[in-house]
Amino acid sequence: MAKKVIGEIKLQIAATKANPSPPVGPALGQKGVNIMEFCKAFNEKTKGMEGFNIPVIITVYADRSFTFITKQPPATDLIKKTAGVQKGSDNPLKNKVGKLTKAQVLEIVEKKMADLNTKDKEQAARIIAGSARSMGITVE
């Protein structure tokens, strides 16, 4: 018989920087999860992804055990890192803060494809390009 699921927790945590302080500690503590065990497992799994916030979905079971799934970093983080900007434009229609080439967009699509809601690479590229435009980054 499968374990009974008592909750699901969705968080975004900096890679290799999970610790018992908020927001991780309180979110896991409410469900009775061993916080340090999660932090060690998460930090180990996200080695090599430093500099990104990693979305994680934690499934908590009735016996207080847990499993977790890490996703790819948000598209905006990948776009900012590739374009070499700190943050998007405050007025994307007037102020352009960076540029991406079509090849760079396709590189982001390769990393993010599993988390997007399409299987078509061309459609995925349009999604990423739209996100970049809304941040004030031009796509050439």
Curated annotation (Swiss-Prot):
Entry comment on modification after translation: One or more lysine residues are methylated.
Keyword rRNA-binding: yes
Molecular function (Gene Ontology), one example: large ribosomal subunit rRNA binding
GO biological process, any: translation
Metal-binding in keyword set: no
Annotated keywords: Methylation, Ribonucleoprotein, Ribosomal protein, RNA-binding, rRNA-binding
Record SUPFAM superfamilies: Ribosomal L11/L12e N-terminal domain (SSF54747), Ribosomal protein L11, C-terminal domain (SSF46906)
Entry GO terms, CC: cytosolic large ribosomal subunit
PROSITE patterns in the cross-refs: RIBOSOMAL_L11
UniProt-listed InterPro entries: Ribosomal_uL11, Ribosomal_uL11_bac-typ, Ribosomal_uL11_C, Ribosomal_uL11_C_sf, Ribosomal_uL11_CS, Ribosomal_uL11_N, Ribosomal_uL11_N_sf
Family: Belongs to the universal ribosomal protein uL11 family.
Quaternary structure annotation from Swiss-Prot or TrEMBL: Part of the ribosomal stalk of the 50S ribosomal subunit. Interacts with L10 and the large rRNA to form the base of the stalk. L10 forms an elongated spine to which L12 dimers bind in a sequential fashion forming a multimeric L10(L12)X complex.
Function (record text): Forms part of the ribosomal stalk which helps the ribosome interact with GTP-bound translation factors.
Protein name in the entry: Large ribosomal subunit protein uL11
Gene name, Swiss-Prot/TrEMBL: rplK
